[in-house]
Amino acid sequence: MDIAHFRGIEQMSWRIPKGTHFLALIGPGDSAKSTILSAIDMALSDRWNLAITDSDFYQGDVEKPISIRVALSDLPTSIRHHDMLGMSLAGIDDASELYEDPDDDHDCCAVIALTVDKSLEPTWTAFRPNKPEPIATVTATARRLIGAYKVDERIDTHLRWSRTSALGRLTEAEHGADELLLRASREARKAVSEAIPPELSELVATIQQRLHALGSGEFKDLKPGLDQSLSTSTGNLALYEGPVPLSNFGLGSRRLAGVAAQQMANADKGIILIDEIEYGLEPHRLANLLTCIKDRTDSALAITTTHSPTALRHLDVDDLGIVRRDSNGTVTVKSFAPDQTYLQKLIRRSPEAFLARRVVLAEGKTDYGFLLELLDRWNAELAEGCKPSSAAIGAVAVEGSGGDTIEWARVLADVGYDVVLFIDSDVENDRDAADALTGNGVAVVRWKDGYNIELAVTDTLTASELTVLIDKAIELSDDPSSYRSNVLDHLHAYGLPEEVTTLLVEEWNEHGVGLDGARATVARAAHRRSWFKRVDKGRALAALLLEAEGYPDSDSASKVQELRDAVFAPAPEGRDTGAPDNPSNATEQ
């Protein structure tokens, strides 16, 4: 698929891996995900009267035409033998490179090219490489054989019988809609309850089965009925559940009912497009819809977009297409390699990472809580100055998983995410591996060599502040009354003389324990006995550091500032800027 000069896309070239049957496009807002679906729909649908305006041209520049080109392989016999399409086939290899003619080493493919110039008149032609001029016009009839459709969001339209609705087209295909609707309308003048021909009742029973499969609701008395909100006979026959029209149900139920009707009306079509698949659905119904679409055997390809962490939790990493758009309007869609399935752990734990523009990876629970506390304080400060928060710039904090965190950072950077890695520096191998990621564009922020987060904090505290830290660890434990003695045991195990029986660090000096020794002992005990190994405890640790008397002039303060600079840094040159799809068009495309 190649797109040029369409809405927020100045240029895009995308090759969907061979054998793909389901894809969920993800990425930050305004990265052109919905535009990609619209482009496929416009190029392959059988509509001839596309509603195109000047704002559909990239930056409103109508002097350069819109160009959308889609190559389709695995063609059904009806297309290969078609009078026009069958004579215009090209070749395509496993790497999606096109050839003028198919041969024994290539699959045959049909390449449909949609062009719109400043006259706003669309033209569809067949394309073959090395042919300078369009070789044939692709008619609406020919495009109908391709079988692509985008789920229509005009939900209530498809819950009524009319010439253009899904129910109307489904009825026309099976029974002849005009005659049935006329009969129903005439009978309705006598008695609404007896107005429904048996053919419609049988059809509704089939629709009810489909609604139940998609999880739309538990319908027991689904039937056609007259929608009194419409004044004409065209389209006032609608689906009812008992005495209530489905158009009066909640958004999720209506949307699933509309999806079911459209699926059935387009049962012969091989490409289904759904924008924002989670719209209006609770998590359990969203999960069921995803399963139904992924398991469909009658479609060659389903492409959806989503901003839902719930949706991602029910998908595999190889179901995802990561969409990125740079400041010049160049759009890329990348997928994870098959050997990167270990990222499934990350998508289950922190799906929001895949939906962000910038991912800030913290090594563990303590670091993650520490980072969250910093972000809250920074965002509050920015709000006072009317400046964008971390959420506004698309940055999200993500809890890592020890040794896996560095590899997660590498892979996320490879597929286009801005990544900030926040880790300890007490393990030499991890330190070296993290530093090596700077060549991949990862911003690595770590404490000075040999330091973990506990030591970075205690190294800044006074004796009385160390006592406050110990008291906070006890306060946040599961059983503070018994944990106090445990803490003393921990300290003895990591260097505190046995004769010291107090947790008041100010008194340790009387037993020969100076401030530097106290800091090291408390840090070792806190780290190895996991005093702060919980998100809320990590937050408390950050607060202790930020409120310490010596913090402003400390090395830890400079590292925290380095972290802040990385989180709020401008997007790297050429990366996704988050600008609207089309500055000349106020609505998101």
Predicted regions and their residues:
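A sensor for short, sequence-defined functional sites
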Residues: 84-174
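Flexible phosphate/Mg2+-sensing switch loops adjacent to catalytic phosphate-binding sites
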Residues: 45-66, 135, 323, 327-330, ...
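Extended helical coiled-coil dimerization/tether regions that scaffold
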Residues: 168-256, 261-271, 431
